[in-house]
């Protein structure tokens, strides 16, 4: 669903459906009163359905990165050994958070565009039997690759008691991730991607094993102390002032997702993603994902040919066609562009992108379009 002005095709923030926009105009209420308690209880219960979990789920007023930081500081102590898997910009971010708080990080790095093999993690666990946690980015937004989280969870559980901490910021709600079914201990995500609301809320699940680790965790924490969040939730409150407007929007967005049915959401996302990849290849582009079976259902990353000026292409798509694409991050800056297809997206949104590219690319001297 594109906005009236732009077809926003970044992998977050994503376009806001009309019911969400309307919910954002709801009047303020007392965040310590019964009305907010009802809102918090309802959204938390619905969020558990999307997470596919019976574990605790908390809604934080923060970005998705806040949830990632929370996952580290609530389960680990300085000096704890952690296996961290990265094949992109956001995997690197998770690594840096763990390092910042003093974890001893054993890094598994893969080429950007490659999937992370569960066998690499299995071998690392065997080499480091005292590892306390494995951290992994499920869907790497910077490369358009979805890693084999199910296989990784199996590899971890069959070889250790390590906690499994998951960055699911650009996957949960769009790509299947049964938190309990796969045995994930802590899963973090954010509001501005699959959940179709503005940035500003973060969501995190916390298992019983994670709570056992919490009792021993010695990393400093205050705002992101999930013990405080749990005590407050039992009273129908949050420990700190919440973004009430985003809670209103979230309540509506969750209703939309659950009414469609999560399985139907996954099917729609997969279909749109397949159409996007097919269309990009038909235009003569090469996907960054080296294994298309692991290509993301929420964002497609595409190599930019040498003959194409990436900044001019992005500018023309926005200024002339009113379509906003995402560029590359870090070492991929200027080398790829990314098409976001998550949230309320339908195939017609991507058809607009493809038609616009067919008009813009020849003007820029790209002959394959």
Language-model region placement:
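Active-site phosphate-binding strand-loop segment of PLP-dependent enzymes
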Residues: 116-173
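Active-site C-terminal subdomain of aminotransferase-like
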Residues: 15-16, 192-278, 282
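PLP-dependent enzyme catalytic core of the Aspartate aminotransferase-like
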Residues: 331, 335-369
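Conserved PLP-binding catalytic core of the aspartate aminotransferase-like
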Residues: 286-320
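Conserved active-site segment immediately N-terminal to the catalytic lysine
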Residues: 180-192
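A glycine-/small-polar-enriched, mobile loop at the entrance of the PLP active site in fold-type I
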Residues: 4-61, 65
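Conserved beta-loop-alpha segment that forms the PLP phosphate-binding cup at the N-terminus of a helix
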Residues: 54-83, 87, 91-95
